[in-house]
Design a protein with these regions (language model features):
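Acidic (Asp/Glu)-rich catalytic clusters
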Residues: 6-17, 87-90, 112-120, 200-207
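Flexible, glycine-rich active-site loops centered on histidine and acidic residues
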Residues: 2-59, 101-103
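A local structural motif
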Residues: 68-74
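A conserved active-site cap/scaffold subdomain adjacent to cofactor or substrate pockets
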Residues: 83-101
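Hydrophobic faces of well-ordered beta-strands that scaffold small-molecule active sites
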Residues: 17-21, 74-78, 93-98, 121-128, ...
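Short aromatic-enriched loop/helix-cap "lid" or pocket-rim segments at secondary-structure transitions
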Residues: 30-34, 89, 136
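Glycine-rich beta-alpha junction loops
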Residues: 23-26, 79-82, 100-105, 127-134
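An alpha-helical appendage that flanks or caps ligand/catalytic pockets
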Residues: 39-65, 106-206
Length: 215
């Protein structure tokens, strides 16, 4: 269904349609289950990506996603790990690092290194930026922003917007032994010139090809 929809859009508007994929839709587990419509909660994401690429590239022998556009939509995978970066590279997709979830420079570098070992494309970086007339004004606007990291077990963390949402998430997945950590989100902030200089610095340090900004 996804391949057919994007092929149709690409046929109607060549060179103007991109397809972006993430591992989770966001929200609480009940919402995710409703969107899954009865499918297994933890399907093989890597195989799903390969199947989607097969339909988009018309490489599936037993099924085809019609129409077949003159120009196929460009594909992007959003992730925050070397595993996601390798998945994108092996499929020939562009990789977008989700720095708005994890802006740790060491993690960005590890993911980009994994991507570049396979792909010649420049990676993208998604982050949050806020510009105001002065740095002081920007600081006032974003000062109260918080992200609540829910720790469910070894290697299992989820970012939520409030302690209440974190507790509700744990309840819906049936976990009673959890921990909630209050953190500040990674935000590029200041006046316009400062935000621009921060983006330039990220570009030089990591070789970012494009930025996706949540503003």
């Amino acid at each position: 269904k996804v391949a057919e929809n994007f092929n149709l859009l690409a046929a109607l508007a060549p060179w103007r349609v991109d397809l972006g994929v993430g591992k989770a839709p966001g929200g609480l587990p009940a919402s995710t289950a409703a969107l899954a419509a009865g499918r297994p909660a933890f399907a093989d994401f890597d195989q799903q990506l390969r199947d989607l690429e097969g339909y988009l590239s018309d490489a599936q022998a037993d099924a085809q996603a019609r129409p077949i556009p003159q120009t196929s939509p460009e594909r992007f995978l959003l992730g925050a790990s070397p595993q996601s970066a390798r998945q994108a590279a092996e499929l020939g997709w562009r990789f977008v690092y989700a720095a708005h979830f994890d802006g740790d420079p060491k993690h960005i570098e590890a993911a980009f290194e994994a991507y570049r070992t396979v792909s010649a494309h420049a990676p993208l970086l998604a982050t949050v930026a806020f510009a105001a007339p002065t740095s002081e004004a920007a600081a006032r606007h974003i000062g109260a922003l918080r992200v609540y990291k829910l720790h469910l077990g070894p290697g299992q963390t989820v970012n939520l917007p409030s302690p209440e949402a974190a507790a509700e998430y744990a309840r819906q997945v049936g976990v009673t032994d959890f921990r909630v950590e209050e953190t500040r989100p990674s935000v590029l902030s200041g006046d316009a010139q400062h935000v621009r200089s921060e983006l330039d610095a990220l570009h030089r340090r990591f070789g970012v090809g494009e930025f996706i900004l949540d503003a």
